[in-house]
Amino acid sequence: MELVVGRVAKSHGIKGEIVVEVRTDEPEDRFAVGAVLRGHKPREQTVSTYTVEAARDHSGRLLLRLEGVSDRTAADALRGTLFVIDSAELEPSDDPDEFYDHELEGLSVRLADGTEVGTVIEVLHSAAGELLSIRRAGDQSGELLVPFVAAIVTSVSVADGVALIDPPEGLLDPDFGESADGK
């Protein structure tokens, strides 16, 4: 399975540097000098390889200089490029409570009594923490956002394809978070 570890947001300066939106927990390894990156534009099949020539932090953003990308025009041509890895390249975690996003996506979400809630469709990362985006099961339409914290997500079994949750009262209600006037 192909996983996105970064995306070229834009060029930076006139010497071919690019700004990368990091989508990995290990940017210091993935984007280290000498690292070979595989990248492609969204919805394109052709994958190109790039070697990192220089990497630095600038105002909280990752800037890269890649071999063969020596000016702003070449850097601009990379805008939107997705840097990818194969999930088989990931090191298995030694921590039983640590998961990669792709391991959680597709899990069946159930209550402790076995009642099916839905399926994890995405893991959202926010300043407040991770959220599981869950497509509701059965005839219930919509999406639920469940904080991925131990107090709510009580058990995850990737092998069994199941996450058990113990939601606080109201979290599963369709109108949770809406005001009385429906806004």
Curated annotation (Swiss-Prot):
Domain of life per record: Bacteria
Sorted UniProt keywords: Chaperone, Cytoplasm, Ribosome biogenesis, rRNA processing
Main location: cytoplasm
PRC barrel domain span: 96-171
UniProt GO BP: ribosomal small subunit biogenesis; rRNA processing
GO molecular function ontology, one term from the record: ribosome binding
Pfam assignment, any one: PRC
Subcellular locations according to the entry: Cytoplasm
This protein's GO CC annotations: cytoplasm; ribosome
Family matches, as InterPro entries: PRC-brl_dom, PRC_barrel-like_sf, RimM, RimM_N, RimM_N_sf, Transl_B-barrel_sf
UniProt keyword Nuclease, yes or no: no
Entry keyword Cytoplasm: yes
Annotated family: Belongs to the RimM family.
UniProt function note: An accessory protein needed during the final step in the assembly of 30S ribosomal subunit, possibly for assembly of the head region. Essential for efficient processing of 16S rRNA. May be needed both before and after RbfA during the maturation of 16S rRNA. It has affinity for free ribosomal 30S subunits but not for 70S ribosomes.
Domain notes: The PRC barrel domain binds ribosomal protein uS19.
NCBIfam families for the chain: 16S_RimM
PANTHER family, per database record: RIBOSOME MATURATION FACTOR RIMM
Subunit structure: Binds ribosomal protein uS19.
Name of this chain's protein: Ribosome maturation factor RimM
Gene: rimM
